[in-house]
């Protein structure tokens, strides 16, 4: 009953609408703050953000159950929602860092410096470790318990996706760990861009491994369909981001912590 089409459709619409509404409302409050000043819009944005964090925590986990975990119909994991959430966190902070660096190099974000990128690098590092923790916890518990209904999920990936399975795990853990452990590497724009590209590739492979074995079984390949979908959604993402960036100033005017952000130093 949970996965019947009407209820599934209603949940999917609720997720997307909730995320869309929160983003639009936060943007509107930020622009209103630029025009009016004061603390009213700022306090409203804080309240909305606090509510949205709770909503996103629940909705992102349920989205993972509905859109990904349900592909392997008879398998479930109570960690799966957090596993997907941590992957979303890594890729989200990675894209923020990479876009910020590109805009900085183009001269659009003159206030951004290595201190701001350092903070983003710490978030990328932290979420990479969180992703690894979730990955290992899920894997170890299922492997140790050795329950047939659970191990089938990993057997399908070991038997037919073995190389990609281990390469993905190494890329998403070892690479960020070794490169971003030091302070200097998190402050280096070139390092962050390089790590960002590798991390995005690694988490694309992670999504591929979550979906493809349940859909194609052993008959899989990375061909024009997979690459085309990736390029298509990347193009759509860049179109939406560029369109949004072109419609508003890239730096706030009346935010109470604007000066503190400009002079941020760590």
Feature map (PLM): residue ranges:
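Long, contiguous internal "core" modules enriched in hydrophobic/ aromatic residues
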Residues: 5-168, 255-258
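Hydrophobic, well-ordered secondary-structure elements that form the walls
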Residues: 133, 176, 207, 249
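A cytosolic-side transmembrane-helix exit/cap motif
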Residues: 99, 210-219
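Short, highly charged, low-complexity non-transmembrane loops/tails of multi-pass membrane proteins
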Residues: 250-266
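Membrane-water interface at the C-terminal end of transmembrane alpha helices
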Residues: 23, 236-248
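Membrane-interface transmembrane-helix boundary segments in multi-pass integral membrane proteins
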Residues: 78-84, 149-169, 188, 216-241
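Alpha-helical transmembrane segments in multipass membrane proteins, preferentially the mid-helix core
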Residues: 97-100, 104, 170-185
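Central hydrophobic cores of alpha-helical transmembrane segments
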Residues: 190-201
């Amino acid at each position: 009953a949970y996965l019947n089409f009407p209820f599934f459709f209603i949940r999917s619409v609720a997720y997307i609408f909730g995320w869309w509404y929160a983003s639009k409302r936060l943007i509107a409050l930020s622009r209103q703050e630029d025009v009016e000043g004061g603390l009213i819009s700022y306090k409203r944005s804080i309240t909305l953000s606090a509510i949205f964090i709770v909503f996103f925590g629940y909705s992102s986990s349920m989205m993972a159950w509905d859109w990904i975990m349900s592909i392997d119909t008879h398998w479930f994991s109570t960690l799966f929602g957090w596993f997907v959430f941590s992957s979303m966190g890594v890729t989200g902070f990675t894209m923020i860092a990479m876009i910020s660096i590109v805009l900085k190099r183009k001269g659009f974000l003159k206030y951004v410096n290595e201190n701001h990128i350092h903070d983003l690098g710490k978030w990328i590092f932290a979420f990479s470790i969180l992703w690894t923790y979730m990955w290992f916890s899920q894997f170890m518990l299922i492997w140790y318990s050795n329950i047939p209904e659970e191990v089938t999920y990993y057997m399908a990936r070991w038997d037919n996706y073995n190389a990609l399975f281990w390469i993905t795990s190494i890329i998403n853990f070892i690479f960020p760990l070794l490169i971003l452990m030091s302070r200097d590497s998190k402050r280096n724009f070139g390092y962050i861009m390089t790590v960002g590209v590798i991390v995005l590739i690694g988490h694309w492979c992670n999504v591929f491994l979550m979906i493809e074995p349940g859909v194609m079984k052993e008959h899989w390949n990375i061909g024009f369909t997979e690459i085309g979908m990736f390029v298509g959604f990347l193009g759509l993402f860049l179109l939406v981001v560029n369109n949004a960036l072109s419609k508003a100033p890239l730096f706030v005017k009346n935010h109470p912590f604007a000066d503190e952000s400009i002079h941020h130093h760590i």
